[in-house]
């Protein structure tokens, strides 16, 4: 039986990291985790990483789409934080970001890793940005690299 599974090292991969500025006190930690994982575990060169900042999580899909359409990147990591408030705004933003990012990956055939935190409160977001629950930015970066390597195997 042949088993295909992507590894994490991708030293020649070109990766875009797209991050929302809104909730930057959390998102900055996600970026640090993602970039650290790309460089340290994935062995991606600094010059092959592009950081793109957008206003908020709702704007992530459009920027991700443009980056995917440019054909300059082997993978894209989308990072942000949406914290539930007292209105339905959470559902619109979280759903729009999630659906939009997912569509880009499927339509462009470029791996887009979803590293957008959708939490009930600030404490949960902080936990997932590098404290109790690990760093979801780092996890998303590793997913992106694994998919780059897996797709290369599938196409070989």
UniProtKB/Swiss-Prot annotation:
E.C. no: 2.5.1.78
Its pathway is: Cofactor biosynthesis; riboflavin biosynthesis; riboflavin from 2-hydroxy-3-oxobutyl phosphate and 5-amino-6-(D-ribitylamino)uracil: step 1/2
Alphabetized, the UniProt keywords read: Riboflavin biosynthesis, Transferase
**Family stated for the protein in its record:** Belongs to the DMRL synthase family.
One of the entry's Gene Ontology molecular-function terms is: 6,7-dimethyl-8-ribityllumazine synthase activity
SUPFAM superfamilies, sorted:
Lumazine synthase (SSF52121)
Q: Where does (2S)-2-hydroxy-3-oxobutyl phosphate bind?
A: 86-87, 128
- Fetch the InterPro entries from UniProt: LS, LS/RS, LS/RS_sf
Task: Please give an example of a GO cellular component term from this record.
Answer: riboflavin synthase complex
**Name the record gives this protein:** 6,7-dimethyl-8-ribityllumazine synthase
- Disulphide bridges: none
GO biological process, alphabetically ordered: riboflavin biosynthetic process
User: Quaternary structure?
Assistant: Forms an icosahedral capsid composed of 60 subunits, arranged as a dodecamer of pentamers.
Q: What does this protein do?
A: Catalyzes the formation of 6,7-dimethyl-8-ribityllumazine by condensation of 5-amino-6-(D-ribitylamino)uracil with 3,4-dihydroxy-2-butanone 4-phosphate. This is the penultimate step in the biosynthesis of riboflavin.
Please name the source species. Mannheimia succiniciproducens (strain KCTC 0769BP / MBEL55E)
């Amino acid at each position: 039986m042949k088993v295909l599974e992507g590894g994490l090292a991708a030293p020649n991969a070109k990766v875009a990291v797209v991050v929302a500025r809104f909730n930057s006190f959390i998102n900055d930690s996600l970026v640090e985790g993602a970039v650290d994982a790309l460089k340290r575990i994935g062995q991606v060169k600094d010059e092959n990483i592009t950081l793109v900042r957008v206003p908020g999580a709702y704007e992530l899909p459009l920027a991700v789409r443009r980056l995917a359409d440019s054909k300059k990147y082997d993978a894209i990591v989308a990072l942000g934080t949406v914290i539930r408030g007292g209105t339905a705004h959470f559902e619109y933003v979280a759903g729009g970001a999630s659906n939009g990012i997912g569509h880009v990956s499927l339509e462009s055939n470029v791996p887009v890793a979803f590293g957008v935190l959708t939490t009930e409160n600030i404490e949960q977001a902080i936990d997932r940005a590098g404290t109790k629950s690990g760093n979801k930015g780092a996890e998303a970066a590793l997913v992106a690299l694994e998919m780059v390597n897996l797709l290369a195997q599938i196409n070989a």
